[in-house]
């Protein structure tokens, strides 16, 4: 009998082992769809981004006009831009839900997969930040100024570092040029990191909602989960096209329709919605360096998740106390997101400070304690 090319060809064999004959737990729910949704988001962003880059000019005098030209004069340029801008929002919705799933079901115990995932998140955040600067509107310019300025809080080397990042003494043409270069490069780095992420995942196999070994109950990925993933793709694209066609500017800032002007500061400088929770944590500390450290800690704290797991059970499926804390954490993040969009005045300042404190308390203290408490309850 001739060998099956799908199983013998060096390249097809890799595809086969990852997407066709991959042994998959039979009971994984729709929460396990977000990994593939992130993959399709990345492909969509790279394709639309490539088409936009063909019409973009990375120059402070021309950037805003070139984006306007793309929307007005290029065939379906408006659609490509709207898909790209709103695709970023959906990318973040998917990654946050993917991380939430990881925390709820104890997926962080696959340490290598979890750590590469956090590095992917950081790279995605960097990509989104430099991309937001490119249209060179008011919020692009001032957002870039405020966020890059945070590096000046680093003792001794801070100011030098900022000027080195800017390529001058303020955000200007060199900054825009290098941000465009970075925005073009980073998605390919994300694609490479994704392969590493998947390599580590396929070493251990997928987790499942029960958090127990599923070796005795695995089914091939294709056709069962490939069809389930395609349904997810259809829903994602339906959501993306609905957003891009009916309310493309829903998640954007009206300030960005004004060309960048270094002499006029917008009344409220704020990042895109997906960074607002971190921005609220940054603003909740009245000290520059302290704020920067809290901002970094808000994401880097995820690296500690595997070490803070004290429960004998992997998932939260049968742990009602931990479930309550998890949903409290989700609610708290929504409150932080809302606070990040509000001006710095009473009562938003104190709400932001309390929400920031709660965020760190839940992750660092309450979840481990609750895990240990539930172990005790199991003995009775």
Swiss-Prot record:
The chain crosses the membrane at residues 34-54, 78-99, 114-134, 179-199, 227-247, 289-309, 321-341, 348-368. Binds 2 heme b groups non-covalently. One of its GO terms (biological process) is mitochondrial electron transport, ubiquinol to cytochrome c. It is a multi-pass membrane protein. It is found in: Mitochondrion inner membrane. One of its GO terms (cellular component) is mitochondrial inner membrane. InterPro entries: Cyt_b/b6_C, Cyt_b/b6_C_sf, Cyt_b/b6_N, Cytb/b6-like_sf, Cytochrome_b, Cytochrome_b_C_euk/bac, Cytochrome_b_N_euk/bac, Di-haem_cyt_TM. Heme b b566 binds at residues 98, 197. Its main location: mitochondrion. Keywords: Electron transport, Heme, Iron, Membrane, Metal-binding, Mitochondrion, Mitochondrion inner membrane, Respiratory chain, Transmembrane, Transmembrane helix, Transport, Ubiquinone. Heme b b562 binds at residues 84, 183. A ubiquinone binds at residue 202. The keyword Membrane applies. Its cofactor is heme b. GO terms for molecular function: metal ion binding; ubiquinol-cytochrome-c reductase activity. The keyword Phosphoprotein does not apply. SUPFAM superfamilies: a domain/subunit of cytochrome bc1 complex (Ubiquinol-cytochrome c reductase) (SSF81648), Transmembrane di-heme cytochromes (SSF81342). It holds the Pfam family Cytochrom_B_C. Component of the ubiquinol-cytochrome c reductase complex (complex III or cytochrome b-c1 complex) that is part of the mitochondrial respiratory chain. The b-c1 complex mediates electron transfer from ubiquinol to cytochrome c. Contributes to the generation of a proton gradient across the mitochondrial membrane that is then used for ATP synthesis. The cytochrome bc1 complex contains 11 subunits: 3 respiratory subunits (MT-CYB, CYC1 and UQCRFS1), 2 core proteins (UQCRC1 and UQCRC2) and 6 low-molecular weight proteins (UQCRH/QCR6, UQCRB/QCR7, UQCRQ/QCR8, UQCR10/QCR9, UQCR11/QCR10 and a cleavage product of UQCRFS1). This cytochrome bc1 complex then forms a dimer. Belongs to the cytochrome b family. Heme 1 (or BL or b562) is low-potential and absorbs at about 562 nm, and heme 2 (or BH or b566) is high-potential and absorbs at about 566 nm. This is Cytochrome b. The lineage of its organism: Eukaryota, Metazoa, Chordata, Craniata, Vertebrata. The gene is MT-CYB.
């Amino acid at each position: 009998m001739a060998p099956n090319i799908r199983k013998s060809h060096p390249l097809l064999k890799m595809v086969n082992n990852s997407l066709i004959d991959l042994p998959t737990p039979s009971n994984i729910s729709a929460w396990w769809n977000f990994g593939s949704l992130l993959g399709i988001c990345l492909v969509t962003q790279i394709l639309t981004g490539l088409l936009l880059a063909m019409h973009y000019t990375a120059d402070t005098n021309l950037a805003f006009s070139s984006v306007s030209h793309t929307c007005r004069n290029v065939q379906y340029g408006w659609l490509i831009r709207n898909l790209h801008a709103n695709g970023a929002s959906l990318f973040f919705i998917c990654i946050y839900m993917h991380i939430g799933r990881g925390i709820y079901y104890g997926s962080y115990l696959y340490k290598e997969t979890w750590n590469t995932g956090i590095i992917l998140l950081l790279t995605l955040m960097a990509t989104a930040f430099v991309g937001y600067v490119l249209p060179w509107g008011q919020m692009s310019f001032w957002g870039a100024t405020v966020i890059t300025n945070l590096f000046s809080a680093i003792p001794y080397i801070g100011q030098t570092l900022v000027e080195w990042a800017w390529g001058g003494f303020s955000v200007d043409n060199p900054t825009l040029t290098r941000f465009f270069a970075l925005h073009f490069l980073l998605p390919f780095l994300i694609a490479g990191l994704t392969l590493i992420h998947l390599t580590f995942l396929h070493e251990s196999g997928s987790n499942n909602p029960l958090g127990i070994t599923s070796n005795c109950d695995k089914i091939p990925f294709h056709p069962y989960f490939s069809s389930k993933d395609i349904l997810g793709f259809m829903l994602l694209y339906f959501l993306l096209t609905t957003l891009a066609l009916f309310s493309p500017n829903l998640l954007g800032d009206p300030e960005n329709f004004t060309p960048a002007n270094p002499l006029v500061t917008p009344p409220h400088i704020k990042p895109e919605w997906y960074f607002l929770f971190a921005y609220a944590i940054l603003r909740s500390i009245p000290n520059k360096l302290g704020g920067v450290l809290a901002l970094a800690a808000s994401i880097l704290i995820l690296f500690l998740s595997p070490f803070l797991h004290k429960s004998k059970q992997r998932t939260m499926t049968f742990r009602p106390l931990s479930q309550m804390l998890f949903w409290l954490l989700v609610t708290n993040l929504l409150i932080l997101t809302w606070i990040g969009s509000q001006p710095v005045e009473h009562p938003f300042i104190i709400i932001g400070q309390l929400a920031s404190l709660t965020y760190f308390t839940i992750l660092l203290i309450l979840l481990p304690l609750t895990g240990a408490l539930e172990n005790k309850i199991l003995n009775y």
